Structure formats: C-alpha cells, structure tokens
Design a protein with these regions (language model features):
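Class I SAM-dependent methyltransferase SAM/SAH-binding core
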Residues: 48-94
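A short beta-strand submotif of the Rossmann-like class I SAM-dependent methyltransferase core
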Residues: 104-110
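Class I S-adenosylmethionine-dependent transferase superfamily signal
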Residues: 33, 63, 124
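Conserved alpha-helix/loop element of class I SAM-dependent methyltransferases that forms part
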Residues: 23-40, 54-59
Length: 204
C-alpha cells in the first residue's frame, strides 16, 4: 500500500493499513440495501429503528417488496404492531425464534448498540446464512461534524445517538470481525456519509 504521512510519526507496529472502497459514496442508502437484498432471502437484525419507528421511512418496510423473503429480528417488539401490516414476512424478538436459512443477514447500525459485541456476533454466526452485511458509524467520516470541545467551559460535545456504546473505524471494524468470527471479510466501504459497510462470507 502507498506510504502515508502518518508513517513517519508513529512506530510501524501501530500503523494499520487496509483497503476501503469509495464506490458507495453519495449513493442512496435505501438503494444500496435494495440492490444487496434484491431477490434474496434476508434476515434483517434491528428492523424497527428503535426508539423512533417511522413506518413510511423504515428500511425494513422499504426492502419488503424486493426480497424473495424478508424476516426481521428486534428486541423492541413493542413496534411490531405498527410494522406488521406493511410486511409479508415474520418479525422475531429473540434469536431462538430464528430457525430458517437465509442468503443474507443484514445488520445495519446495530453493532454499536449491543452490550457484548462478541456474543452478538456469535448469535449472528448461528443463523444459517451464507453472507453477513454490517454497517456501523464511522468515526473517521464523522470527526469534523460530530465532535467539538469548548476549552473555556471544558465541555466536550459529541453528536451521537444516546444509546451508542462506541464508534468504529475501518481498522477496528475489520479487527472486530476477524477477532470474534471465522468469516471471510470481502470488503469494507465508506457508506452513507457517516458509516462503514462490510460484507462477509461465512466459512461454513
């Protein structure tokens, strides 16, 4: 890979480099997910957009007509009643209810919410599916617009969903997937102006 200005500022051990695609920059979020899920059987994890469920803007509702089969999983089942009339598939509130086989497990903007990332990835791995598509908030893309510090009042300002536990970068997302799964990571892309999108193939 090409040399970076950071190479001369840090010990080589701490300088991490990996390929990140920019083909999805500027692409509509719903359209990208539609193309990924088109004609496939999909399990959508985190399907209700908690805590603000807007049915007309809900990703799960938008994807439903385009998938061969679309089921949803979310612990916030209080929102199921508003979504179900617009859906053909099933909605699950617990991993134990997921018994079918899928082409894709879609996990958009969920990883940053979960209390135990390793256990969460194990649950995804138990689902019989060939591919996993994950998106997470990207600290690199959000740095200039989401963080500020007022020295006079010693106040740190962060624009973030109040339920988030962490941010990711291309390296830490890559490292998390490789550390806690046996999946084959097919790529990471900058996505939606604020996120990273990763596609992984399960090894079994």
């Amino acid at each position: 890979m090409s040399r970076s200005a950071l190479d001369s500022l840090h010990e080589p051990y701490f300088v991490q480099k990996l390929w990140v695609g920019d083909e999805l920059v500027g692409r509509n979020r719903f359209e990208v997910f539609r193309q990924i899920c088109q004609g496939r059987s999909v399990l959508h994890v985190g399907c209700v957009d908690w805590p603000i469920t807007r049915v007309d803007d809900n990703l799960h509702v938008h994807l439903d007509p385009h998938c061969a089969r679309l089921d949803g999983l979310d612990v916030h089942d209080e929102a199921f009643a508003s979504l179900q009339p617009r859906l053909q598939g099933r909605l699950f509130s617990d991993w134990s209810q997921v018994q079918d086989e899928y082409d894709v497990v879609l996990v958009p903007e969920v990883l940053e919410h979960v209390p135990n990332v390793a256990e969460f990835l194990i649950e995804i791995d138990r689902v019989r599916a060939s591919h996993v598509v994950l998106t997470v908030p990207d600290a690199y893309q959000c740095f200039k617009r989401h963080f500020d510090y007022d020295r006079d009042s010693q106040t740190f300002v962060e624009v973030v969903h109040p339920d988030h536990n962490n941010w990711y970068t291309p390296y830490t997302l890559n490292n998390t997937i490789r550390k806690y799964t046996s999946w084959v990571l097919q790529g990471i892309w900058f996505f939606n102006g604020i996120s990273l999108l990763a596609i992984a193939q399960k090894s079994h």
